[in-house]
Amino acid sequence: MSRMVGTVSRGLRAPIIRQGDNLVDIVTNTVLEASKEDGFAIHDRDVVAMTEAIVARAQGNYATVDDIAEDVRAKFGGETVGVIFPILSRNRFAICLRGIAKGAKKIVLMLSYPSDEVGNHLISLDMLDEKGVNPYTDVLDLKTYRELFGYEKHPFTGVDYVEYYEGLIKECGAEVEIIFANDPRAILNYTKNVLNCDIHSRFRTKRLLKNAGVEINYGLDEILNHSVNGSGFNAEYGLLGSNKATEESVKLFPRDCQPFVEAIQKKLYDATGKQIEVMVYGDGAFKDPVGKIWELADPIVSPGYTAGLEGTPNELKLKYLADNDFASLSGDELKAAIKGKIQEKDGNLVGQMISEGTTPRRLTDLIGSLCDLTSGSGDKGTPIVYIQGYFDNYTTE
């Protein structure tokens, strides 16, 4: 009888991770114990993945509001700073904003509209249309914004982020001015010192600002890209990918993930004789069709993965084959024909009709989405995900 089960994704329960824990041992032991308890065999090319949160927690990669403030003060001189394009999030940005405000005399906060970079809306597109506002060209001050749109609350969180961010800045002792624009160069009419807080568009933003005459410009990826007073840091991403830990601190995106995943791969190989792929994952990069939010507030889906996860899928579209190449076949004859086609497929199907409709995403992004959806972001207690059969196809027995 042919095999009936394809890809399986399991969320594995793990201990609560604390700073200094040996995560390589914990992950390895969790996989081995789960295999025994649940009765599944370990195979070559299985995938084990860990949330970035437990990696950062084990590393103790944390920083305080005061650490952020000191770095901002050192880079901008403690004067006026234009803070542009932050995402609207209590978890992702509010604590960072407190640190930034404590390190400056005045904050000119420039928010993109109608939404932030990942789809959190201040207002709707319909409201822009109704008021005749052009988001590509119009720069609004706070008074004009309120006259046009009033006090809108986020539909999921119930927070008016304009009011919330304004209050945070004032609480930290800084003056605040708020404007709304989508061209980063608009901030230069208010200050030449700019901290751009966008994530995926940050390189373009920096280029535009540089060409327009910015005097001091750093990205959020350059704040806490080194340790301040013994704090955590991330040399590549700085504050990008950080989360609220407490009211006074953030957990930073993990660093040194490559040696970590390779150490787990080796330990599992020593224990099982199987070559298992290993990765660290953060946000899954999928988009909510209702809320329109893109689940990628992290700078990258996977900050570390083993070599076997490099690249993109190379797959045929079975529906296309069944409806076109083998439209006259059915039953076992159709099954045999499709299996034969899979076995003889080219090593690179890019641009070929038979691959049309397959997902052109990197393996780590696809698997990261699967892992994020499997582990969830709440109280499941499964920060380790074990995937089997991901690299199988219809011919695999």
Regions found by a protein language model. Name each.
Residues 2-44, 53-397:
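Conserved mixed alpha/beta catalytic, RNA-binding, or beta-rich assembly cores of soluble enzyme
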